[in-house]
Swiss-Prot record:
Gene3D superfamilies: Helix-loop-helix DNA-binding domain. Its main location: nucleus. It comes from Danio rerio. The gene is ptf1a. It is found in: Nucleus. GO terms for biological process: amacrine cell differentiation; animal organ morphogenesis; cell differentiation; developmental process; exocrine pancreas development; generation of neurons; hindbrain development; neuron development. GO terms for cellular component: cytoplasm; nucleus; transcription regulator complex. Residues 115-167 form the bHLH domain. This is Pancreas transcription factor 1 subunit alpha.
Amino acid sequence: MDTVLDPFTGLDSFSSSYFDDDDFFTDHSSRDHLDTDDFLDEDVDFLTNQIQEYYKDSRISQDGDYCDVGNFSFSSSSSTFSYGCADSTSELSPHRDGGLLKRRRRMRSEVEMQQLRQAANVRERRRMQSINDAFEGLRSHIPTLPYEKRLSKVDTLRLAIGYINFLAELVQSDMPIRNPHSDALNQPKKVIICHRGTRSPSPNDPDYGLPPLAGHSLSWTDEKQLKDQNIIRTAKVWTPEDPRKLHLKSSINNIENEPPFNFIS
């Protein structure tokens, strides 16, 4: 053994136990495992500092809060890191997948909450304004009686439904007249006459020198002849209900208007 180590100078400083002839070529696999805590102290301290710096930067950029170095600890027997922030503690395993920390929901400040409330109030006011404008347009298209105050939304919808039903009845009653399969011979014929007028030959006329005009003439009847023949015309007239009287009725389920009656003129 001494002959082998002769070329290597400076080995005298090592303990003789390292070069024991009995132990130098002995298989140490059968020996008990050595305690690794002494060998891992420096690595653990390095990793702890790196993890602390990482979470310190992350907390400052997000929440402005971070964990202290003293909250980190290492245990060689369990091979786990533990840390604690504020009042909470959790365990981090090297074999666990996913992030090391759950992102905490950022708490909104009082200024942000006030801005959100103001924005919600503005949206609600705009929504109510659009609804009121729509009801005003509906009131302007419905024939109503001269009321002392403006109609409510419920009364406006009730009158609108009745007026729509009345118009639907008028359309249905007018369908036979507009039916193309009806007898066309019984319909009064309209005479259309096409003529071409001539311009005045007088130079003093404003139309002098212009080309002749083309026009049409339609047949027409005199309204006075109808009166002389005692002809009576009838028409359907829709009378809106008075909302003030609806509250006096026992049943308010029927929101349609009463059937229209014939108006004799």
